[in-house]
Amino acid sequence: MDIFREIASSTKGENVFISPATISSVLTILYYGANGSTAEQLSKYVEKEETMDKVSAQNISFKSMNKVYGRYSAVFKNSFLGKIGDNFQTVDFTDCRTIDAINKCVDVFTEGKINPLLTEQLSPNTCLLAISAVYFKAKWLIPFKKEFTSDYPFYVSPTEMVDVSMMSMYGESFNYASVKESFGNFSIIELPYVGNTSMMVILPDKIDGLESIKQNLTDTNFKKWCNSLEATFIDVHIPKFKVTGSYNLVDTLVKLGLTDVFYSTGDYSNMCNSDVSVDAMIHKTYIDVNEEYTEAAAATSVLVADCASTVTNEFCADHPFIYVIRHVDGKILFVGRYCSPTTN
């Protein structure tokens, strides 16, 4: 959560969407070639790939790609290449066609949703370029019916309002909790997808209450809040939205303590014999949240439609909120902030 908090703090008023899981994956690749304090700092973000493999195998709407491009004139150690396999490729960074090739690869992989990835010519001094790309488009286990979607006011601030396409469902049972903390009160709800992932939406009681929640959004707190959820019949209203994210993570990670990882301070002597530096870490994301549902999910919603009369709660995301997409084992795959409908 620390990467999200840092990015959200530096981009106030903007939508944010990142994938901590894929960022950890590409940092793990760098860890394989690191030594000394560089390896020590990177070890904080090294995680097993097992969860990502499970998601990829069971949810065909999830795609992630991590790549490390190295300068063709550098000789990389076999021990390093053996650990990263197909995630590594040597290129000529001085050739303008290199950017086109990288962009084409990402474009095809993400079905045209992330293009272009690189928008500027790389420096001829570039030795290494690390990239993580992710595409996520999932179907709800319980669908939002399109006939219930309508224009609805979204409060960007207590004094500013814009209309959004608000998806609605009535009388369904979701895991839900109303949380009271010293830094603010909020609601949290779990909206499951088909497969093995779900979206957790954290909605402050106050229109302008998201900042304090963001500041206190730690892995420990998030797990505590999720453990407080209980099955509740509830009306749900959430905006229909698309969000893209584009970040160079170097400055963010340096602020978080990875001071010996980038530029000339990085020790990658386990990667190659010559001096190399990580000059950029590009992270682009895309998410599409809409009413889409599978036939099986639609049948499920019909089975409980007669419960609408028992609803005593309402979850209406008509002001800025945080959303977290996680695997059933608790691993966080994505985290985002939705606060600016006009930038969709």
From Swiss-Prot:
Keywords tagged on the record: Host cytoplasm, Host-virus interaction, Inhibition of host caspases by virus, Modulation of host cell apoptosis by virus, Protease inhibitor, Serine protease inhibitor
GO MF annotation: an example: serine-type endopeptidase inhibitor activity
Cellular component aspect of the GO annotation: extracellular space; host cell cytoplasm
Residues the UniProt record annotates as site (Reactive bond): D306, C307
Keyword Transmembrane helix: no
CDD domains xref list: serpinN_SPI-1_SPI-2
Gene Ontology biological-process annotations: symbiont-mediated suppression of host apoptosis
Compartment(s) where it occurs, according to its Swiss-Prot or TrEMBL record: Host cytoplasm
Database matches in InterPro entries: Serpin_CS, Serpin_dom, Serpin_fam, Serpin_sf, Serpin_sf_1, Serpin_sf_2
Function text: Viral serpin that inhibits both cysteine and serine proteinases involved in the regulation of host inflammatory and apoptosis processes. Major anti-apoptotic protein which inhibits both intrinsic and extrinsic pathways and strongly cleaves host CASP1 and CASP8 but is a rather poor inhibitor of host CASP3. Prevents the proteolytic activity of host interleukin-1-beta converting enzyme (ICE) and ICE-like enzymes. Can also block apoptosis through host tumor necrosis factor (TNF) receptor.
Family: Belongs to the serpin family. Poxviruses subfamily.
Matches recorded under PANTHER family: GH10112P-RELATED (PTHR11461:SF211), SERINE PROTEASE INHIBITOR, SERPIN (PTHR11461)
Entry protein name: Serine proteinase inhibitor 2
The gene coding this protein: OPG199
